[in-house]
From Swiss-Prot:
HAMAP family tied to this protein: Q_tRNA_Tgt (MF_00168)
Residues covered by region (RNA binding): 246-252
InterPro entries the UniProt entry points to: ArchSynthase1/Queuine_TRR, TGT, TGT-like_sf, tRNA_ribo_trans-like
Organism for this UniProt entry: Francisella tularensis subsp. novicida (strain U112)
Gene3D superfamilies: Queuine tRNA-ribosyltransferase-like
Identification of the protein by name: Queuine tRNA-ribosyltransferase
Description of how the protein assembles with itself and partners: Homodimer. Within each dimer, one monomer is responsible for RNA recognition and catalysis, while the other monomer binds to the replacement base PreQ1.
Binding site for Zn(2+): 303, 305, 308, 334
Cofactor: Zn(2+)
Gene this protein is translated from: tgt
Organism lineage: Bacteria, Pseudomonadati, Pseudomonadota, Gammaproteobacteria, Thiotrichales
Reaction equation(s) it catalyzes: 7-aminomethyl-7-carbaguanine + guanosine(34) in tRNA = 7-aminomethyl-7-carbaguanosine(34) in tRNA + guanine
Record-annotated active site: 92 (proton acceptor), 265 (nucleophile)
Keywords, alphabetical: Glycosyltransferase, Metal-binding, Queuosine biosynthesis, Transferase, tRNA processing, Zinc
Length: 367
């Protein structure tokens, strides 16, 4: 029996306002989860993440398993004890990382054999191992082990990949056993609606605590992503959280909420921050651009983050040019605050029954 509880508070069209509850804390939805690949969101402390409104973060099973390994993490009790984050943590299963290794992997019915990107040694990962690693990490939300269908894929390739993922989903559920953490199933099927339907039907039959849409934002055109979302999101169980994996831009989040999604994660705000790409209420600023050299205005006049309250575009441009670590930190603080504030605004609009209006306004102003 899972310790997770999901309350659907309100709906506007397909958009949903809810709350996911765990012993470690509540998550107001729609929610964005900052990504802490190695247990840490790059350059930020848990205190800073909490200050910007994050209620859950994502950790990476694959990378944490390879380094430092679960024995070291278990000495701290859990990943929470290791990284000092005392709120909920979702861990992905490692399936996407294995997918991204490309030709360095060998896929069989049993699992995946690959060369460790750390020392080149041979490593094997299966649904059973992924479930054990996530149990050792003490994750609040565990993701079932799947194969992320590549893009482009023929219908035959997408079908075979999806069917393998469904067999692995069943093995993940069996191996999860008496673990009280929530277990989410992942819908695959590439860009083919009928395969997505088959996948969802199978996952409902196996029965999971939440459902995720995988295999999007892997290089497909935006209209394909929206087409699959339009088709799939509203068919997912109404009484369980819906999670869109690895997505995306601010516009993507607004459009996915409109279609009924509750949870998101993406490296974009933190990765882009380190490359000088800043999200603002009017669109993206590239702080490296020489036009900001003597610009004494803040990044975003509508933002209340530490960066916007204390520093100018000119100073952030200077930090970027001189490759100061502080530049990455200040940019990351701003970008992740922007994402959390966007989710707060979405939740407020849903609370007040004006999300349709909010979406229209946001899409018109955000370039």
């Amino acid at each position: 029996m899972t310790v997770m509880k999901f309350d659907l508070i309100k709906k506007e069209g397909k958009a949903r306002r809810g709350k996911i509850s765990f012993p470690r804390g509540d998550i107001q939805t729609p929610a964005f989860m900052p990504v802490g690949t190695y247990g840490a969101v790059k350059s930020l402390s848990p205190v800073e993440l909490k200050e910007m409104g994050a209620e859950i973060i994502l950790g990476n099973t694959f990378h944490l398993w390879l380094r430092p390994g679960t024995e070291i993490i278990k000495k701290h009790g859990s990943l929470h004890g290791f990284n000092g984050w005392d709120k909920p943590i979702l861990t992905d299963s490692g399936g996407f990382q294995v997918f991204s290794l490309g030709k360095m992997r060998k896929l069989t019915e049993e699992g995946v054999t690959f060369k460790s990107p750390i020392n080149g040694s041979k490593v094997f990962l299966s649904p059973e191992i992924s479930m054990q690693v996530q149990r050792d990490l003490g994750s609040d939300i565990v993701m079932c082990f799947d194969e992320c269908t590549p893009y482009p894929a023929t219908e035959k390739e997408a079908k075979e990949s999806m069917e393998l993922s469904m067999r692995w989903a069943k093995r993940s559920k069996d191996a999860h056993g008496d673990n009280p953490s929530a277990l989410f199933g992942i819908i695959q099927g590439g860009m083919y609606e009928h395969l997505r339907d088959e996948s969802l039907a199978k996952l409902k039959e196996i029965d999971f605590d939440g459902f995720a849409i995988g295999g999007l934002s892997v290089g497909e055109p935006k209209e394909d992503m929206i087409r699959i979302l339009d088709h799939t999101a509203h068919q997912m169980p109404e009484d369980k959280p819906r999670y869109l994996m690895g997505v995306g831009t601010p516009k993507d989040l607004v459009e996915a909420v409109y279609r009924g999604v509750d949870m998101f994660d993406c490296v974009m705000p933190s990765r882009n921050a380190r490359n000088g790409h800043i999200f603002t209420s009017e669109g993206v600023i590239k702080i490296r651009n020489s036009k900001y050299k003597d610009d004494t205005s803040p990044l975003d006049p509508n933002c209340d983050c530490y960066t916007c309250k204390n520093f100018t575009k000119s100073y952030l441009h200077h930090l970027d040019k001189t490759k100061e670590i502080l530049g990455s930190r200040l940019n990351t603080i701003h970008n992740l605050t922007f994402y959390q504030n966007l989710m707060k605004s979405i939740r407020k609009a849903l609370d007040e029954g004006r999300f349709a209006e909010f979406r229209k306004e946001f899409l018109a102003n955000y370039k």
